Amino acid sequence: MELVAELLQRPSPVPLDARVFLQVHAELMGPIYPFAGRWRTVSLHKGDGPTRWPLPPGGIQPLMDVLERDVLSRSPLLSEDDEKVFSYAAEVMCEFLALHPFREGNGRTAFIVANLIFMQNSMLPLTTYERRSDEMRYLAACEAGRLGKQYRPLAMLLMEWEDRAVAQWRASHE
């Protein structure tokens, strides 16, 4: 992504805010959806089930303001302790996904922002998410974060995926 590359080239690490999510989403989904880079204005359903993410009366922006105040304000998180980095990335992803602020592309946007957090900490971006084998664990981990603010399950998955990314990088550079 050009945006992430540009953010990483800045002289100091870029703090996360709602604009970063909007920009990532616009760049990622812009070629596909006319509503890319804008908060959703509709309730969301998964399949034929009930409304899963109702549209709040005040819209999405007030919820993003809370996310900025309570979570994103601690960015950029720079740490030599990888566990702190994974824990923070998991919290950002879980809290963002709990809001589901876009009509489409929330998961992909969350992964790209997590990769920005990792790369700001000299870690590799995640490239090894295996949908078939990891999807149920990933969804369960996100649900644990959404319902109970339990971020550790997702942090553990992120660590596992980072280990895979490192192993792939090493194998390709031997």
Where in this protein do the model-derived segments appear?
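FIC/Doc superfamily catalytic core
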Residues: 1-174
